[in-house]
């Protein structure tokens, strides 16, 4: 990504839900797009629901690594609101660890512009 960062330090469980910023067990390497476009909307849905209702949410984020790749291919995000049996929040989504215009080697983490040698 010319002049910009491709990779972010990604919280598996978003900061707005944990208040933790540097827990190594909650961090993976992800693309800027996965972090700010892919994951953030789901994290915010849960955070807003909790703030508005004070209800509990079962929430799990699982990074998916293929074979011995160093970089996750994405994360599975699952959420279920407890007190209302999922009528407030209920989703199970997969967010891909991609960046538009960039080709990523998930085994090594190396990247290049699509179409470049």
Report the location of each language-model feature.
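Domain-level detector of nuclease and nuclease-like folds
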Residues: 1-117
């Amino acid at each position: 990504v010319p002049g910009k960062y491709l990779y972010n330090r990604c919280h598996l469980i978003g900061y707005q839900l944990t208040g933790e910023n540097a827990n190594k067990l909650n961090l993976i390497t992800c693309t800027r797009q996965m972090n700010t476009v892919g994951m953030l909307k789901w994290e915010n849905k849960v955070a807003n629901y909790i703030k508005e209702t004070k209800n509990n949410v079962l929430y799990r984020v699982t990074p998916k690594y293929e074979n011995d790749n160093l970089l996750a291919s994405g994360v599975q995000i699952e959420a279920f609101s407890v007190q209302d049996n999922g009528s407030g929040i209920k989703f199970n989504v997969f967010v891909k660890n991609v960046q538009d215009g960039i080709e990523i080697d998930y085994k090594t983490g190396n990247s290049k512009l699509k179409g470049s040698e």
